[in-house]
């Protein structure tokens, strides 16, 4: 967890996802956006995932980032329980992450999951997208996003 006010929840299905999903936290740290990082599974701990998703908005969170591989149901399960934007990060698995990509992107109408690239690049872009969403209502965050974008172009 970061020291800033928590605005983003970063969730992952298992401990093995941590090396990839920490990339999202690194970007949010750079942008000075507070986050909470948790491990919970749509399959193994569904009540915990449901409780987290259901209470996130009430805790002041603005965006949830979910990373999962294989069946990759975490982002969809969370999106079905929160009014917040959910960003799905498909993680690499036996089928090079294509199974997770398809599971993350194929959601029914009314339960959107914004889906980014597979793996570490996707985790970074999920954080950048979360920052852009938060920046629409926070000029200071928006300026840090602009500054980061411009620095990357140099």
Regions found by a protein language model. Give the residues of each.
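Basic/polar N-terminal segments that are highly enriched at the extreme N-terminus
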Residues: 1-5
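N-terminal beta-loop-helix "entrance" segment that forms/cooperates
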Residues: 37-59
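C-terminal binding/interaction regions
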Residues: 12-19, 96-154
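Short glycine/serine/threonine-rich phosphate/pyrophosphate-binding segments
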Residues: 17-21, 46-49, 68-77, 96-98, ...
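Glycine-rich phosphate-binding loop
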Residues: 52-90
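Short, ordered loop/turn segments at secondary-structure junctions
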Residues: 15, 40-42, 69-70, 91-94, ...
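Glycine/charged-rich beta-loop-alpha catalytic/anionic-binding loops adjacent to active sites
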Residues: 7, 33-36, 83-84, 106-116
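Glycine-rich phosphate/diphosphate-binding loop of Rossmann-like nucleotide-binding domains
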Residues: 6-44
């Amino acid at each position: 967890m970061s020291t800033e006010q928590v605005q983003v929840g970063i969730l992952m299905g298992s401990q093995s996802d941590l090396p990839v999903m920490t990339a999202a936290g690194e970007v949010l740290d750079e942008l000075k956006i507070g986050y909470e990082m948790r491990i919970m599974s749509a399959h193994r701990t569904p009540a915990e995932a449901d409780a987290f998703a259901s209470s996130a908005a009430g805790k002041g969170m603005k965006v949830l980032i979910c990373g999962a591989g294989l069946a990759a149901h975490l982002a969809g399960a969370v999106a079905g329980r929160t009014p917040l934007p959910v960003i799905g990060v498909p993680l690499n698995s036996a089928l090079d992450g294509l199974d997770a990509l398809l599971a993350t992107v194929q959601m029914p109408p009314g339960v959107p999951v914004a889906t980014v690239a597979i793996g570490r690049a996707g985790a970074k872009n999920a954080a950048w997208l979360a920052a852009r969403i938060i920046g629409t209502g926070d000029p200071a965050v928006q300026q840090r996003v602009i500054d980061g974008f411009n620095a990357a172009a140099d």
